[in-house]
């Protein structure tokens, strides 16, 4: 792992066991990706993308969904938000691979004061309206936001699309592989899938 800068999951996902040395050097593994991120990302703004709460504050006008923060004494605001939105997505301030995200159904909440207290205790202070997706995307895996991931690089003048992938969940709160999700690579020019879907357990998902 140290020699090739390859994490365990990279080794599995990229089939390193069957690749030769030349092929291994072409893989953008997590350690390499992190290195480039810290090299080229502007330190002044990098923190916004690690802080889920700050992200919503900064990009609120572009989110296309309602959100609120749980504070010491806003039980009534939380209840009103829940009455307006039947599905609630909560987020802790930081976390990766979907670990900071949870989903609740307003109809199942009987005591809003107790729910408010539990959210504060667990640090789930950001509440978001659930995203409703296009029917064609939702039809593949309903119940989870199936996100399109775009890896891009800005050279100072132009933004280059390096890779695109479509992720799908399995009905959980997030589409991450830790939740059983899978992905398929997309053609950057057409947006069409380049093949079947794959998860972190070696399963192939026919699309």
Regions found by a protein language model. Name each.
Residues 2-7, 102, 192, 206-207:
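Proteins with a high burden of low-complexity, intrinsically disordered sequence enriched in S/T/G/P/A and R
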Residues 20, 104-106, 187:
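Short, solvent-exposed coil/turn linker segments
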Residues 1-61:
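Low-complexity, highly charged intrinsically disordered N-terminal segments
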Residues 15-33, 79-100, 197-202:
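Short N-terminal signal/transit or membrane-insertion segments
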Residues 1-5, 18-28, 92-93, 166-183:
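Charged, low-complexity, helix/coiled-coil-prone segments
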Residues 141, 145-207:
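ATP-dependent carboxylate/phosphate-activation module, predominantly the ATP-grasp catalytic core
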Residues 35-156:
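Active-site nucleotide/adenylate-binding loops and adjacent lid/helix of ATP-dependent enzymes
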Residues 4, 30-32, 85, 116, ...:
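Histidine (H) residue identity feature
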């Amino acid at each position: 792992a140290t020699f090739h800068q390859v994490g365990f999951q990279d080794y599995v996902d990229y089939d390193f066991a069957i690749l030769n040395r030349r092929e291994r050097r072409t893989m953008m593994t997590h350690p390499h990706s992190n290195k480039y991120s810290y090299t080229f990302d502007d330190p002044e703004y990098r923190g916004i993308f690690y802080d889920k709460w700050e992200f919503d504050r900064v990009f609120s006008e572009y989110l296309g969904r309602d959100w609120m923060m749980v504070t010491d004494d806003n039980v009534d605001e939380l209840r009103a938000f829940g009455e307006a939105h039947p599905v609630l997505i909560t987020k802790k301030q930081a976390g990766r691979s979907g670990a900071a995200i949870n989903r609740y159904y307003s109809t199942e909440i009987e005591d809003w004061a107790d729910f408010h207290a539990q959210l504060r205790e667990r640090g789930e202070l950001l509440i978001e309206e659930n995203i409703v997706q296009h029917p064609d995307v939702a039809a593949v895996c309903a119940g989870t936001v199936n996100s399109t991931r775009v890896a891009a690089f800005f050279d100072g003048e132009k933004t280059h699309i390096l890779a695109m992938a479509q992720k799908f969940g399995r009905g959980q709160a997030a589409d991450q592989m830790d939740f059983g999700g899978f992905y398929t690579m997309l053609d950057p020019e057409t947006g069409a899938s380049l093949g079947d879907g794959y998860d972190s357990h070696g399963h192939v998902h026919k699309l």
